[in-house]
Every structure is written in structure tokens, then in C-alpha cells.
Design a protein with these regions (language model features):
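Surface-exposed acidic, glycine-flexible loop patches that form ligand/cofactor-binding
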Residues: 7-12
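A conserved short beta-strand
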Residues: 13-19
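Active-site-adjacent substrate-binding region
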Residues: 17, 24-135
Length: 135
């Protein structure tokens, strides 16, 4: 992502904003408002979480704040300047803050949940739909 932060895929291309989906399909996923997302793109976080709430997905898109996570969105924000958020499943129950199966051999297709994917997908479709109505 560091390369793309400095070298857009199309010359002079500039996105309005970006959304990174990071481990967003697990059963009982919780997506707090991630620290760098709130620092660089609080209005995008607000749009996404507001849409999730209005669709009834507040149990996934929680209003808790998390510590900053250094991932692709950090570089897109800090190098490219495109406001970008990270929707990431975090757990207060583990030492790492990530789900127990994160980067483990137990991470497999059985952990993917249709309802979580539906919540994320419908939320983002609503965000995109609302964006296209404005522009």
C-alpha cells in the first residue's frame, strides 16, 4: 500500500475517500471507531457508523473508540492525503486486541458469518448510494 500511496493506479487519480475492510466477516464481529480513522477521516467514520445505526447494525458498528492500528489506511492518509478509514473487528477479550483466530491456523472459512457480511455490505451500499445522491 505504501507504493500505491505514492503512485496512483491512474495518473492524476484522486479518490474522495477510502474504506479498508479488515477482518469484517467473523461471527459476532465488533467494529469500534479505530484511532487513525478518527484522526484522519472522522466525517467518513461518522457517515459509515450513522448508516449502520439507521440500518439496525449498531451491534456491529459500535461507538467505542479503539487505539490506532497501523495498517494500509494509515499510509493512504499520511502519505497520499486521501481520508481513509479502517473497519476492523477488534476484541477487548484478547491480549492483541484482535480476534483469537487472527493470524492463526484456526482462521478458516468456517469463521465467516453471513449476517456479519450482510451488515457490512448493506451499510457500505447505503453509504455509496447516499454519496452518489449528493454528487
Amino acid at each position: 500500500m505504501l507504493f500505491r500511496s505514492k503512485n496512483p493506479h491512474v495518473k492524476n487519480y484522486r479518490a474522495y475517500y477510502g474504506i479498508l475492510l479488515d477482518m469484517t466477516a467473523a461471527v459476532n464481529a465488533r467494529f469500534p471507531k479505530e484511532g487513525f480513522s478518527m484522526q484522519y477521516a472522522p466525517s467518513i467514520v461518522g457517515q459509515v457508523w450513522s448508516n449502520a445505526q439507521s440500518l439496525g447494525y449498531g451491534n456491529y458498528f459500535v461507538s467505542d473508540l479503539s487505539n490506532p492500528i497501523t495498517d494500509d489506511h494509515y499510509y493512504v492518509n499520511s502519505i497520499n492525503g486521501t481520508p481513509t478509514i479502517d473497519i476492523i473487528n477488534l476484541s477487548a477479550e484478547t491480549k492483541t486486541g484482535f480476534a483469537p483466530h487472527w493470524h492463526a491456523q484456526t482462521d478458516n472459512m468456517n469463521l465467516i458469518d453471513r449476517e456479519t457480511m450482510k451488515a457490512v455490505g448493506q451499510t457500505l451500499l447505503q453509504v455509496i448510494y447516499n454519496e452518489s445522491a449528493v454528487n
